[in-house]
């Protein structure tokens, strides 16, 4: 049976998130501060409070299997013996704006964790508590709701029912993709000297990584200029992915010119096999992708300043569907054109689209830089293939990424 794996947050936010992009409430500093506050509140809750509890459940709907998993911020039993799911949220919103219904996604996350917990512990009822921490005043505001296990189970099933068309779309795509990759041929009449050996080593590394599961395997390659390293890496990685030895390929580079080399290699594969089913996206820097900059030339990621940020999540699904129904490679031009048509941010659109793509091309920092790395992929385990171009540049880049900056 085909199966879709989803995190609780991914499921909830994709279906229920509304509103706008607002840089005042996002970013690395906010995320780090939120994590510190989470740990502080969890520690202060006492011995009976279990923090970061991993929960997973399996569901079947219309012939599709779903694996839903995530970590509940906290689970404890109150004085009345009721199990409580605690969902902690940090916010910069004014205290009087922190209402019980401020964000439906927050309740939804807690309710999905509650559904899984109730199923695992065979509970008839439980409570879901939202704990809001106001970061400017250190004030804590809590709201609690009581649910039956049947209510929570019905809620989770309703979310999955809403997600079904998207799940079916992705499963159908992966089946077509793997079938076309199985038939994919090397796009040149012959290999260059040393190219076949290099491609073979890349393929074996991808296959070994799948076999070893945790940690995968690593391959370091050094080859002379002109051997065709880009195709020697991409072609075998694609063949391995088509055989189920990886769900997504990340081609990471230090320079725009090497990103273009990856795009050119994929274009050659598509030209050699017009039936090839392959989604690739190139992630540009926010400064280059932005369609609305402030007076100083910086991205104006505020709903009151940018029409592409304002109401972004209301229009995102239509923009995604538009792109996923097309066959063009999702480069900067394609993202910009779609973003203008749907009035969404092209940078964020590229990030959201990357979850549906087979190949993601971008800068090293999307994997290695703790301030901008793609948390949607790398904060949890995934069956990924990483192709790191010009890896000799990594030490200098890593030193810059992990060095303190003083303003």
Regions found by a protein language model. Give the residues of each.
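Conserved pre-motif I regulatory segment
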Residues: 173-222
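Phosphate-binding Walker
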Residues: 228-235, 256, 260
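Signature of the SF2 helicase/ATPase Hel1-core->accessory helical subdomain module
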Residues: 233, 342-359, 364-407
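The conserved Walker
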Residues: 225
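Walker A/P-loop NTP-binding motif
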Residues: 230-245, 265-269
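Metal-dependent nuclease catalytic cores that hydrolyze phosphodiester bonds in DNA/RNA
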Residues: 1-78, 82, 104, 108
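A substrate-engagement module of RecA-like helicase motors
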Residues: 178, 185, 214, 245-360, ...
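Mg2+/Mn2+-dependent nuclease catalytic core
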Residues: 57-153, 233
